[in-house]
């Protein structure tokens, strides 16, 4: 009989100790450490990255809020069999392991964790005593086929809509096959062993269950940090989700296509959440694809300041940068702002479906430095369709002008700020306007990155971070590939260097990455309910 409760395991203990991590954790609300049923909740990366994920923390909170249920967290840290943060229980002792994966590069980490736990990688090789392996998160909703040889079931969409089906299915009588039958019959779950018939899944049943605007306005619907810890990217910040979706429809961005139309959480719910954070921290982080577009962002920031919090935002759309928002953020102690112009060319930005002229960007950058901010991060993409070397040179022109504005506005303060350019390579994502496009020729990318490096070297107080071309090729492959990527993923999980990996699987990578996709796309069996 399948049981979701932890059982004894013969796996040896790992040298990695979670005791210092537990000591630093401050739960916002108390939770029961034990329930009749327990779920292994795994993040396929380090504790630092995983506990920075609001989605991961939201699932943890929701499971613990379910009567008779608890969950224990697992991360990539250490090199022995993974053990839980809460009780040091080994991963293979649980009846079900639910991974949250937001980045394609973590597919390999997921397999590494399974291998270290002694859990068979391929789903067909698992027996009745092996845990069920589930994968949720944004990657599952983009293209679950890549991992379909390894994963027993994919919950598709928002955890709030999926856990009420998943947890009872795990708790009912029956073996693992009975659980998979129950999930396959429910909306919002892709079960490869049940839905795969030859090359095509059963299209009629596969829907992605996202949160509706009405659900987001219901009591308890606001995702917030469940456990505050200094051991994250946000260092003891209490994170609050402001909205979902995005008012823009940029052709390269999955979030604008895959998360539904822009909708925001009620202001009263956000202010109540801020109040709950008081006992555990004085730092807040507001996160969303479009934080500044919440209709009451100014009121929220001012109220947070009044309560004595230091606040920051994940990023702000260029049109949403206002003097009032900047003043509130600066007053709370924030000195860094992130914008995403994506390209230096007005014309190319229009083709991105992001018609924001450089004149508006410069106006907002002047406001930012005039308000006293000293750190500006600008994100750009290269390898875009119809991009030229001149468009890449335009990125340098934008950086130079932003630097001039920084020096002009900060001169009276005697402070010299910093500008960082983060440059990524276009990875054509499923469900975006450019899902059929290819990755740019590596030689062209090398030349354009060299142009940027040479240009930035001439700009004091401007730094550059660029994506690895090899990593971009690998990410593009596993983003768009089907089940035939299993051998490559297994090679990567066993430690094959990236250069050797790209050589060994060159033919498949050439097809997926450098040839334009035609006809029906393999991932187009998912639809949003």
Label every model-predicted segment.
Residues 76-201, 430-482, 489-500:
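Glycine-rich beta-alpha loop elements in corrinoid/cobalamin-binding modules
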Residues 10-40, 47-48, 192-240:
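N-terminal [4Fe-4S]-dependent radical SAM core
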Residues 41-42, 272-377, 382-418:
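Conserved SAM/AdoMet-binding glycine-rich loop
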């Amino acid at each position: 009989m399948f049981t979701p409760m932890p059982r004894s395991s013969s796996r040896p203990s790992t040298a990695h100790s979670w005791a210092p991590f537990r000591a630093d954790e401050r739960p916002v609300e108390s939770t029961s450490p034990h329930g009749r049923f327990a779920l292994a909740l795994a993040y396929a990366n380090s504790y630092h990255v995983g506990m920075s994920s609001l989605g991961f923390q939201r699932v943890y909170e929701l499971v613990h809020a379910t009567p008779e249920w608890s969950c224990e967290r697992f991360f990539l840290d250490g090199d022995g069999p993974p053990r839980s943060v809460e009780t040091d229980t080994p991963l293979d002792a649980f009846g079900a392991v639910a991974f949250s994966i937001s980045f394609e590069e973590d597919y390999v980490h997921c397999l590494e964790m399974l291998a270290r736990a002694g859990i068979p990688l391929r789903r067909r090789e698992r027996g009745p005593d092996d845990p069920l392996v589930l994968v949720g998160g944004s990657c599952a909703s983009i293209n679950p086929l890549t991992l379909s040889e390894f994963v027993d079931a994919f919950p598709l969409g928002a955890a709030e809509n999926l856990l009420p089906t998943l947890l009872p299915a795990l708790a009912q009588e029956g073996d693992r096959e009975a659980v998979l039958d129950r999930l396959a019959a429910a909306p919002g779950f892709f079960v490869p062993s049940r839905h795969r018939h030859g090359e095509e899944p059963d299209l009629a049943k596969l829907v992605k269950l996202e949160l509706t605007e009405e659900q987001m306005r219901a009591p308890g619907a606001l995702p917030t940090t469940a456990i505050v810890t200094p051991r994250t990217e946000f260092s003891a910040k209490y994170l609050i989700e402001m909205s979902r979706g995005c008012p823009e429809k940029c052709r390269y961005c999955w979030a604008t296509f895959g998360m539904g139309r822009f909708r925001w959480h009620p202001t009263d719910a956000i202010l109540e959440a801020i109040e709950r954070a008081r006992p555990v921290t004085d730092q807040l982080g507001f996160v969303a694809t479009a934080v500044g577009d919440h209709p009451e962002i100014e009121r929220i920031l001012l109220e947070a300041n009044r309560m004595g919090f230091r606040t920051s935002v994940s990023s702000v759309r260029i049109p949403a940068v206002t003097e009032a928002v900047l003043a509130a953020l600066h007053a709370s102690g924030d000195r860094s702002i992130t914008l995403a112009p994506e390209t230096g060319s007005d014309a190319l930005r229009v083709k991105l479906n992001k018609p924001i002229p450089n004149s508006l960007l410069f106006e907002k950058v002047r406001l930012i430095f005039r308000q006293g901010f000293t750190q500006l991060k600008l994100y750009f993409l290269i390898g875009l369709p119809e991009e030229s070397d001149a468009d890449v040179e335009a990125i340098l022109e934008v950086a130079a002008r932003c630097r001039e504005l920084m020096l002009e506005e900060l001169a009276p303060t005697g402070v010299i700020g910093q500008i960082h350019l983060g440059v990524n390579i276009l990875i054509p994502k499923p469900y975006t306007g450019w899902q059929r496009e290819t990755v740019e020729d590596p030689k062209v990318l090398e030349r354009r990155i060299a142009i940027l490096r040479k240009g930035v070297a001439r700009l004091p107080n401007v730094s550059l971070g660029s994506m690895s071309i090899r990593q971009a090729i690998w990410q593009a492959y596993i983003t768009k590939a089907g089940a035939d990527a299993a051998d490559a993923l297994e090679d990567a999980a066993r430690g094959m260097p990236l250069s050797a990996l790209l050589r060994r699987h060159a033919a498949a990578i050439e097809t997926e990455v450098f040839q334009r996709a035609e006809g029906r796309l393999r991932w187009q069996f998912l639809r949003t309910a």
